[in-house]
A protein has these predicted regions:
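A short, Lys/Arg-enriched amphipathic alpha-helix followed by its capping loop at the start of a domain
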Residues: 3-12, 44
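Glycine-rich FAD pyrophosphate-binding loop
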Residues: 8-33
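Generic enzyme active-site microenvironment
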Residues: 16-17, 144, 273, 280
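Conserved N-terminal helical subregion
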Residues: 43-47, 54-155, 163-168
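Conserved FAD-binding catalytic core of PHBH/FMO-like flavoproteins
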Residues: 45, 126-130, 136, 141-245, ...
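FAD/FMN-dependent oxidoreductases across multiple families
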Residues: 221-313
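C-terminal helical "tail/cap" subdomain of flavin- and related membrane-associated enzymes
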Residues: 300-389
């Protein structure tokens, strides 16, 4: 949707085909599902006119604290005064509402909700997509943005490297006694990371955080079946006194964790963005931001090409997009996979080595700055839409 809004604002005509019903995606209530929006992604929202609507809905991330199993020692990433936050946390519903509202105001966007593409054709001069209701759409470029199981990617025969972590992420919303102070906690255990992400207080002033707890696949069903009392006891044991007394603010849910990376992200008049191109572990909260970087780069490649008289699906436009995004996406994917494996090594010796390493990072300002820039998405050659407004 972000890609469609950016292209429409640049003057392109866009069809958006969505198999889901917008009403279901924006249903009332906090379900615990939330996303971290990095500094660079927030800049993108600013350029697209989304920031004024979203700003009061998000909780700034003032710092990120990293700890190994509640043992002594941690790394705290906190920007200098005047540098702003490390990002913002939003309930996914708030992001969807803002995107749907912005898209509805764009006359260049044709919306096809509750629809699926049943046939795709690509050729030297254009593409077509036949919808489930028989409608045939024609364009110059086809973009696959349907997520990890992208049928557009599969239809194009693009090879994918993938593996299953055999873990699931348990998602829940927590209400808690202590204010979170804008700190996002990443507590690592051999079974997987345990993240506490700061959310806005509710209308009554109740402090809230989103929980993302990684558990082994074999244990996930048992965790989901626990009574609320037993589940909260397990959560307290994992988080210590970080947030004080806790209660459930939203029901539990889960999703499987896996890695995949495509051999290429373009083909004839085809581009892949987001999870259709690369799926990573949520360990650093970079999945959505990686997709937004794809969108910003593709918008710039297409709009620059249009100014030169090239159509959006021109091979030169797509080659530039692939050169720009392939290495960054691969590096982020490998880094998150490496962190997952590093902190998954059990034993006291491994824990000691990790804590010594964290202590070293804590003392080395240039290295801490590099990690913070990566988390904020402001390193490397950025699309103009990711630069400050």
């Amino acid at each position: 949707m972000t890609l469609a809004i950016g292209l429409a604002r640049a003057g392109a005509s866009v069809h958006v085909v969505d198999r889901d019903d917008p009403a279901a995606q924006t249903a009332e209530g906090f379900d615990g599902r939330a996303s971290a929006i990095s500094t660079a992604s927030w800049n993108l929202f600013g350029h697209l006119g989304l920031a004024p609507l979203l700003e009061p809905k998000g909780s700034p991330i003032a710092a990120i604290a990293v700890n190994d199993a509640l043992r002594p020692g941690k790394i705290e990433f906190r920007p200098e005064e005047g540098e702003g936050s490390l990002g913002r946390m939003f309930a996914n519903r708030e992001l969807r509402l803002a995107l749907f509202d912005a898209a509805a105001k764009q006359p260049n966007i044709a919306w096809h909700p509750s629809s699926t593409v049943v046939a795709r054709e690509r050729g030297p001069h254009g593409v077509s997509a036949t919808l489930s209701d028989g409608t045939v759409l024609r364009a110059r470029l086809l973009v696959g943005a349907e997520g990890r199981q992208s049928p557009t990617r599969e239809d194009a025969g693009i090879a994918v490297a993938r593996w299953d972590y055999r873990h699931r992420a348990i998602i829940a919303g927590l209400a808690h006694a202590k204010p979170h102070g804008g700190v996002a906690w990443e507590i690592f255990y051999p079974a997987g990371p345990f993240a506490l992400l700061p959310m806005l207080d509710d209308a009554t002033g109740q402090h809230r955080s989103a929980l993302v707890w990684t558990v082994a696949e074999d244990d996930a069903a048992g965790v989901l079946r626990m009574s609320d009392t037993a589940f909260l006891a397990e959560v307290r044991a994992k988080m210590g006194e970080v947030l004080g007394d806790i209660e459930l603010a939203a029901p539990r849910s889960s999703y499987p964790l896996g890695f995949h990376h495509t051999a290429r992200i373009v083909a004839e008049r085809l581009a892949l963005v987001g999870d259709a191109a690369h799926g990573i572990h949520p360990i650093a909260g970079q999945g959505l931001n990686l997709g937004l970087r794809d969108a910003a780069a593709l918008i710039e490649c297409i709009t620059d090409g249009m100014r030169l008289g090239l159509d959006p699906g021109d091979a030169q436009v797509l080659a530039r997009y692939e050169r720009w995004r392939a290495s960054d996406a691969l590096m982020v994917a490998l880094a998150t996979d490496g962190l997952t494996r590093l902190f998954g090594v059990p034993g006291r010796t491994a824990s000691l080595v990790r804590r010594i390493g964290m202590a070293g990072v804590q003392r080395m300002a240039p290295l801490k700055r590099w990690f913070m820039d990566e988390a904020r998405g402001v390193s490397g050659t950025l699309p103009k839409l990711l630069e400050p407004v």
